[in-house]
Structures are given as structure tokens and as C-alpha cells.
Amino acid sequence: MILLADSGSTKTDWCVADGAAEICRIATHGTNPFFQSADEIAREVDGGLLPQLGNRPIEQIRFYGAGCAFPDKIAVIRDVLAARFTAADIEVG
């Protein structure tokens, strides 16, 4: 399954898909590594995303978000996600 994210500073829209089939949509508060620390982003993922995601086996993550234009900011998002989805191929842009 793939986890797609469209994130701005105020909200993040997540979609879980399996092939061409949409499995579910999840909405959380926004994430922006220019304005939030890795710890703040991690708390949002842990408290907002993971409880709604359940045990779904995520193989790929594509995170497209505000503030993800520079390598150091991309790394913040990638590191938070990689710590929680250890087997997933992660792309941040």
C-alpha cells in the first residue's frame, strides 16, 4: 500500500491506496519543517496519523508538503516518517 500526503502549514490530507483503489483518507494538522521541530511533527504523526492508520502495511510514502524545498527540511520529514515506517520507501518533496 502507498501513503500519499498533501501537506500545508494548517492541514495535511493523507490517502492510503492499494493499486488504483483508495482505501481511506485521513486528515491531520499541517506540518511544515520551517515552523515546526522534528519533535512537533513526530507528535502529530504519532497522535493524528498512526491511530487512524491502524495496521495497514505501508510500503511506500509520498509526502508533498510546504517547507519541503531544501535538503535539510526534507530530511526532517523523512527522518520522522522513516522512524515509524521502517520498511517503506519514502519520498519527500
Which residues does each predicted region cover?
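Short glycine-rich, Thr/Ser-proximal phosphate-binding strand/loop in the N-terminal lobe
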Residues: 2-43, 57
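Glycine-rich, highly charged phosphate/nucleotide-binding loops
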Residues: 41-51
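Intrinsic-disorder/low-complexity peptide segments enriched for small residues
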Residues: 1-2, 51
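Alpha-helix initiation/capping motif
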Residues: 28-30, 46, 70, 86
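Short beta-strand-loop/turn "lid" adjacent to the catalytic site in phosphate-handling enzymes
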Residues: 52-91
